[in-house]
Amino acid sequence: MSKSFKLHSVFKPAGDQPEAIRKLEEGLENGLAHQTLLGVTGSGKTFTVANVIADLNRPTMILAPNKTLAAQLYGEMKEFFPDNAVEYFVSYYDYYQPEAYVPSSDTFIEKDASVNEHIEQMRLSATKALLERRDVVVVASVSAIYGLGDPDLYLKMMLHLTRGMIIDQRSILRRLSELQYSRNDQVFQRGTFRVRGEVIDIFPAESDEWALRVELFDEEVERLSIFDPLTGQLQHEVPRFTVYPKTHYVTPRERILQAMEEIKVELAERRQVLLANNKLLEEQRLSQRTQFDLEMMNELGYCSGIENYSRYLSGRGPGEAPPTLFDYLPADGLLIVDESHVTIPQIGGMYKGDRSRKETLVEYGFRLPSALDNRPMRFEEFEALAPQTIYVSATPGKYELEKSGGDIIEQVVRPTGLLDPLIEVRPVATQVDDLLSEIRIRAAINERVLVTTLTKRMAEDLTDYLSEHGAKVRYLHSDIDTVERVEIIRDLRLGEFDVLVGINLLREGLDMPEVSLVAILDADKEGFLRSERSLIQTIGRAARNLNGKAILYGDRITASMEKAIGETERRRAKQQAYNEERGIIPQGLNKKIGDILQLGQPSMRGKGKGRGSHKMADTTQYQSLSPKALDQKIRELEAKMYTYAQNLEFEQAAELRDQVHQLRQQFIAIS
């Protein structure tokens, strides 16, 4: 039986949180399909959501707009629910180049990808948790709307083992091969199995800490045990165990054979169409590529780019929605859309971009028309599949407001009593010199400044100018990858520099209590970067500081500025009245830097003899390393580990393997 959610927190709901929690729960229990939580920056929206999840005790999916915010939410939810299943589901590609064709230059680009094994394991763990238990929170990016293996086929492929079961060794090995596990008697790692006499060791694909030992007596399963794959130490016996497939995309052999016949029929029809239109090159290209794929599927059970035949493999009709993570979520599940003003448009935009690329591939004979059905969900399909939904944002979009029927649940008063920033409007003519003097005031009292510009060129020039005049400044732009971005933000918080200049990156999800001033240059240039929503989000970056202030440089007050200033002042007045009424003195937020960056850091694995006690000492010396330096250190330790293994010095190799595992967790956390 599944456990109930148990919320761990030293804090109790305060400010507007108790009322927001009550209204959200009331709405969900009354069957409302859509609700919007308008929570200002720093008001504890995540804590409110965690309380709702704990009280209603329903499996929950939280959608975040990007991997960085998803990791931050995952870390926070892990802290709130340490005894429950908090899972992480984002794209497992470190690098992904989709298959594409450029007709103008007759260039075909092969699919190329690099898969992050740790994230793949976390994805498998997420779907397993959704299938097995109800106390589950899955934090996902918009990767959740992309095709995933059919849950019905996935369930059918599972291998169920029970103590006393009659099954011979060959049958177990054959079933493991069907689940795409590979036999490796030398290197025991995730997704492999090994055989020693009548003992089969299986390393489940969704696990990174324990493995299963199956002990047979003739054709009977005599014992099932969980053990540590590194030390071989038995932990406990289990009466039954379910081995899940190594990948979400496993398909029974009979389904593959049936799909192959259907692909042959479509190929014949498509060839006739191409020949009728005198497209001889395209017809020859399509025949050659598809026949090769069919031969691979017949021999190996899969082929490169097998996802393009997913319609046949999952038994769907033309145009039907692909199975996604939403198909794994129970009907009474709960969906939380974080930063909904960004996430909702993303969901709507994924389908069309994917479709245009694939239409070119089909037109020029690289793929069959059925490849168009290997796609993300359309927005209307997402709406039909989504369970009861709570949209969470400081600036909800038009869609959320319409769906919620205008009944918005506000969370404006912060538990800390902090007020929204004061806003000043100053002229553009002297904006750079005025900004420089403000920076010097903030730097002198050890506070930080965020500056947002309109263009990349302006950001670069401003950074150079400020640097020449003695300011410690860095520039954040779109070419900087996620790992380096996190490193820059951490350095700002640590005081390595005082000013961070950016364009559109200084908005959602940046949690920096040290920032006391936000400067918005050319605030009167109406447009996407200076819309009401963008201005409120950017102003909100100073809302976590006791002396928070926003300066908008503009020679006139635009409609967006007027609305943003009006809304901020309305919130500030409400917060001030609440504080005065209850005698609350605002308190600054002293959030530890490690709290933000050590996202979802697992507890030490070592609980048995000879394990864990020495590792903490070995890895603490690397805690302060930057992501780049940490990556280099991991590579060095891996090289040493393999050297030890080649010299048959397995104890030293095992110790280094444990260190590498711990450092990888640390690297993922700060990425």
Curated annotation (Swiss-Prot):
Q: Where in the cell is it found?
A: Cytoplasm
Mind listing the UniProt keywords for this protein, alphabetically?
A: ATP-binding, Cytoplasm, DNA damage, DNA excision, DNA repair, Excision nuclease, Helicase, Hydrolase, Nucleotide-binding, SOS response
Q: Where in the numbering of this chain does the Helicase ATP-binding domain appear?
A: 26-183
Q: What does the entry give for GO biological process?
A: nucleotide-excision repair; SOS response
Quote the Pfam families the UniProt record gives.
Answer: Helicase_C (PF00271), ResIII (PF04851), UVR (PF02151), UvrB (PF12344), UvrB_inter (PF17757)
Q: Where is the UVR domain?
A: 631-666
Give the Gene Ontology MF terms in alphabetical order.
Answer: ATP binding; ATP hydrolysis activity; DNA binding; excinuclease ABC activity; helicase activity
The record describes its quaternary structure and partners as: Forms a heterotetramer with UvrA during the search for lesions. Interacts with UvrC in an incision complex.
Full protein name: UvrABC system protein B
